[in-house]
Amino acid sequence: MKYSVELACDSSKAWLDTVMDDFGSFLQDHADCERKASAMAMSFVAKYPNRKEIIPELIETAIEELEHFQQVYNLMERKGIALPSEMQKDVYMQQLMALTHGGTPDTRFRDRLLMASIVECRGCERFKLVSEHIEDEELSRFYKVLWASEAKHGNIFVKMALKYFENKEVYDRLDELIQKEAEIVSALPLRPALH
């Protein structure tokens, strides 16, 4: 049985070039994404306290994402890059989350888990690209370690969904959402941001 998510499209070279041209802004956005990822994991705990089988893993994920935020923040401090006072809206996340509206509470729960997997896998793919192309050795090492961690996160959300839903239902819906994510990511305006 597969747990990993295979994205339907790769990130473009134009996206990578945009990030490399303004890496300070990318770091600022990355820090905010890690903070939001931690909050998202805890929001599952708050919204679904009856799903006890996944709560320990959600808490562990939230802590790990918060540690990633701290690591990015420390990198920014060493490089003299401040946390921004205001972050841009994440159109990617807004469009993805719009796909989870409607349906029953159970299908929304399923879709939110699957969407979390897709988002983590997109982050993994992009962190890997950064690690392979950035010239700064410290940043290259950091992003190499980070993409391996994000790959694990992508897998755990699929595993969580499989605790509550049939394999066919999970993978059919996952395939639908992966295709929609590819459409969204391909249409995004280029900016030095994770999404």
Model-derived regions: residue spans:
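Non-heme di-metal
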Residues: 1-195
